[in-house]
Amino acid sequence: MRRRLGRWIIVAVLAGAGCDDTVDGPGPVLPPPPPPGGAPPLAATVTVPPNYGIHDTFVRDGIAILCVWNTGIMILDVGGGGRGGTPTSPVTISTFAPSNGSLASPAIHNAWWFRNPSGVKRYLFLGQEGPATLGASSSGDVKVLDLSNLAQPTEVAFYRVVGAGAHNFWMNEQAQVLYAAFYNGGVVALDVSGSLAGDLAAREIARVQPGGSDSTFVWGVMLAGGRLYASDMLSGFWQLNPQTLQPIGGGQNVPERFGSDLWVRGEYAYTGTWGNREGTRGDAVKIWHLNGSGAPSLVDSIIVDGINTVSDIEVSDNGRLLVFSAEGQSDAGLYIYRLTDPEKPTRIGYANVVQGIHTVSLGRVGTKLYAFAARNPSNPALLIYDLSSLDTP
C-alpha cells in the first residue's frame, strides 16, 4: 500500500465520534477516564506566509527557529535573543531561504541547532522534505547553515542520500554525531565535528534500513540514555546500536497502524501513529516499557477518538507531562497528559485546533514551560501555549 507524503499528503478520513480517550492494551479493563482538562492559555500567535506553511520548531536558550517550508526558516527571539522578545511577544531576528538543493523548492521541514562540547552554537542542521510515496521513495537533503550571526545565516554544507529524503533528526552533541531519519533510506549517522563545508558524504559513519529494503520508512530517531531508537512507519519501534546502527531490539511490533513520532524518557517510550492503514486510523499513542538492555515491549496504548494522526510527541524536561499534536477530524489539536504513572497517562489539557497541529516542541523560557505548536497547512501559524499551570508536581 502506498500513500503520498511530503508536500502532497493524502490521508483517508474516517467518520468518528466525539473526543473520547481510552487506554487500550494488555491488562484489565480500565474505568472511564476522568473529565478532560481545559485548554492551556494561548500566549501568542505568530502567523507565517502561506507558502505551504509551518512545520517543526526548534527551541533553545530563548530562541525559536521555525521551519517555514518554502519560506525557509524564521528565527525568533522569545526571551534569549537580546531583541526584547518574549513568549507572549516574539520578535523576528531574521528570515532565510536556503537553496533548493535536489528539490524544486526549499521545503524546510525540521531543524537542530547544534551546541558542540565547547558550548559553541554555530551550525544549524535542516531537513528538506520533498515529495514521497510511503513504502517506495522520498526526497530531500540535509542542509547546514552557519548561525554565527543570527541576523545573517549563511548556507555552508549539505548531505544527500540519492532516492531518499530527510525527515527528523537527533544528535549526540558530546560525540558530535547527527542521526537522521531518511524515510526509505533508513537511519544515517554523520560525523559533524570541526568545520563543515560542501558535500558531507565522506562524513557518513553508518547507514541502515532497520526493516530491510522492503519494509523501511523511518519517521524519526532519538538517543536516550546512550541508547538509540527509531520509529518506522512500516516496521514499528526499534532499538539500534548507536555506533553501527544495527537493530538490537524491537521491530515488527506495530502491524495494525503506520508509525509516526517517538519520545523516550527513562524506562518508558511513547510513539505516535499516522493516517490510515487498512481501515485503522492513526489515533493511538503506543506506550512501551524498556527492559534492562533497552529493548521495547508494548504495555498499553492511548486511543483518542476523533483524530487521524498523532504527528509529534514529547515529554517535558522534568518528566511530568506528555504532550502530542493531533491532526484530522473534529478533535485535532494539542493534547497534554500527566505522567504520574508513566504506563497510565492522565489527560489534563486539550486545545482544539480544527485545522490540526502538525508539530509541537516544548521549550522552557526562564522557569516557565511553553508548547510551540505548528498550525498547518490552512492559516499557518506558530501557536505558543503557556503550560506553566499544568507543569506542577
Please describe what each predicted stretch is.
Residues 20-393:
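Feature marking well-ordered beta-strand scaffolds used for ligand recognition
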Residues 15-18:
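C-terminal motif of bacterial Sec signal peptides marking the signal peptidase cleavage site
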